[in-house]
């Protein structure tokens, strides 16, 4: 069974969809791609734009209150970008696109972006890549569409209200508290700045969210910053598994504004680029030490790796165990 109590972020790049599934699967007791694909296909996990906004995986029961927290901020950012580039879309055009989406997706249909574009063109709407991206992004943050059933490797859209059963509406304070709890339960120790970066919340709202769950948090001063630890987090005990293959855009890196505790700044470029592309990395005893990728040979699935930390020597047995876990995930 898969239960998401948080969201994960990812970007839409070539081969990223397998990495997205691995990000969930590697955290399961029995990793298997079929279980993750089933959850995505059935709508237990949704892949949509929310928070910062980039692509995220969201538990279905969390989607509405998360959209309520971030929708206006995302719309303002998108509108500001469009205005600055002379590419504004009118509210009438957005309304028209929403009407068409309601008609063509009604009846629990799932359609790809290209299929939707063909319907838009027939309805007199502009359907080039720019307009489609804006139309679909607005429909997502308005809570009209979300990810649909899996069509092979192609992302699809479906009507949110047909895909996700009704859920109790939360107040803004309840939503802020729930988001803060989810973050610090899974990312602690972390700072206010980390939480603000991850959530997309302004510092004032991020600070309010932390104050709402203050009884659940411990705070420690270290390196001139306040670090928060959720009371559900283990602070002692033996960690299992010294080496992990982290997918691109994994929460271990992207979930924090400051990553220097696990990755020296001089190695940043080996893990991610200045324009926000994150690579698959090797995690050894809590530190990022190298890269890995799928095998270069077509029929080979055993991953390849390279180290950029020259002071680290990894045992072959340890590497093989980590790689075999990934291979088992792909084949189960």
Language model feature labels by segment:
Residues 1-8, 13:
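Single conserved hydrophobic/aromatic residue that forms the stacking wall/gate
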Residues 14-16, 104-112, 187-190:
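Short capping segments at the starts of secondary-structure elements
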Residues 20-30, 117-129, 196-203:
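Short helix-coil junctions and helix-kink-helix linkers
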Residues 39, 112-121, 139, 192-196, ...:
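A short acidic, leucine-rich amphipathic alpha-helix
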Residues 40-99:
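A contiguous, low-structure linker/loop signature
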Residues 43-50, 141-150, 214-220, 292-293:
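A short, conserved structural fragment
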Residues 212, 216-267:
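Non-catalytic regulatory appendages
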Residues 265, 271-332:
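Glycine-rich, small/acidic residue-mixed loop/short-helix segments
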């Amino acid at each position: 069974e898969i239960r998401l109590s948080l969201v994960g972020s990812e970007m839409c790049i070539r081969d990223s969809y397998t990495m997205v599934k691995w990000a969930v699967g590697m955290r399961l007791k029995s990793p298997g791609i079929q279980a993750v694909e089933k959850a995505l296909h059935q709508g237990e996990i949704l892949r949509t734009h929310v928070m910062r906004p980039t692509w995220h995986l969201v538990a279905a029961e969390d989607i509405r209150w998360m959209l309520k927290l971030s929708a206006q901020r995302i719309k303002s950012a998108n509108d500001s970008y469009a205005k600055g580039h002379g590419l504004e879309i009118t509210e009438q055009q957005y309304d028209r696109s929403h009407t068409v989406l309601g008609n063509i997706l009604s009846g629990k249909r799932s359609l790809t972006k290209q299929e939707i574009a063909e319907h838009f063109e027939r309805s007199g709407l502009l359907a080039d890549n720019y307009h489609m991206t804006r139309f679909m992004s607005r429909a997502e943050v308005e809570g009209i569409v979300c990810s649909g059933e899996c069509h092979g490797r192609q992302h699809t859209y479906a009507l949110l209200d047909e895909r996700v059963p009704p859920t109790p509406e939360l107040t803004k304070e309840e939503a802020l508290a729930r988001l803060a709890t989810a973050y610090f339960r899974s990312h602690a120790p972390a700072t206010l700045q980390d939480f603000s970066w991850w959530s997309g919340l302004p510092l004032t709202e991020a600070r309010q969210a932390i104050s709402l769950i203050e009884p659940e948090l411990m705070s420690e001063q270290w390196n001139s910053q306040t670090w928060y630890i959720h009371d559900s987090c283990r602070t002692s005990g033996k960690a299992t598994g010294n080496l992990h293959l982290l997918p691109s855009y994994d929460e271990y890196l992207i979930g924090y504004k400051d990553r220097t505790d696990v990755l020296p700044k001089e190695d940043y470029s080996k893990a991610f680029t200045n324009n926000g592309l994150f690579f698959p990395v090797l995690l050894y005893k809590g530190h990022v030490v190298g890269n890995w990728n799928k095998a270069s040979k077509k029929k080979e699935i055993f991953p390849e790796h390279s180290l950029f930390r020259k002071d680290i020597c990894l045992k072959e047995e340890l590497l093989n165990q980590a790689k075999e876990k990934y291979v088992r995930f792909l084949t189960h």
